[in-house]
Amino acid sequence: MLPTENRLRRREDFATAVRRGRRAGRPLLVVHLRSGATDPHAPGESAPPTRAGFVVSKAVGGAVVRNKVKRRLRHLMRDRVALLPPGSLVVVRALPGAGDADHAQLAQDLDAALQRLLGGGAR
C-alpha cells in the first residue's frame, strides 16, 4: 500500500499535475509528472514528499475491475516513489486495456513511462 504522505488527494493537485506536468503515454496507461520545484540549498526546509494519484474510469471496467487496477497501480508506485524527485506530483491514468492486463504488463508500462519522463528514454 502506498503510504499516506505519498497519496495525492486534492482536486487542485490532480489538476496541477495534469495541466502543468509532462505526459508519457503507453498502451495501458498515461503518466503525468509535475516535478517538484524545491530549492535543495534553501535553509531549514525539508523536501516535501513525492505524491501519486490514480484515475481509473468506468471505461476500464466495473467496480471490481477498477479497484483491482487501482490496487495494482498503488502497489507498483510504492516501490517507485523513491526514484522520483522530491515534491513531485504523479497522476497515473489507466486506459481501457488496463482492466485485462496482468501485473507484469502494468509494471512494464509504468516503468517505461516513468523512464521517459525522467529523461532516460528515447521517444
UniProtKB/Swiss-Prot annotation:
GO terms for biological process: tRNA 5'-leader removal. It holds the Pfam family Ribonuclease_P. GO terms for cellular component: ribonuclease P complex. It is an enzyme of class 3 (hydrolase). It catalyses: Endonucleolytic cleavage of RNA, removing 5'-extranucleotides from tRNA precursor. GO terms for molecular function: 3'-tRNA processing endoribonuclease activity; ribonuclease P activity; tRNA binding. Keywords: Endonuclease, Hydrolase, Nuclease, RNA-binding, tRNA processing. NCBIfam families: rnpA. RNaseP catalyzes the removal of the 5'-leader sequence from pre-tRNA to produce the mature 5'-terminus. It can also cleave other RNA substrates such as 4.5S RNA. The protein component plays an auxiliary but essential role in vivo by binding to the 5'-leader sequence and broadening the substrate specificity of the ribozyme. This is Ribonuclease P protein component. The gene is rnpA.
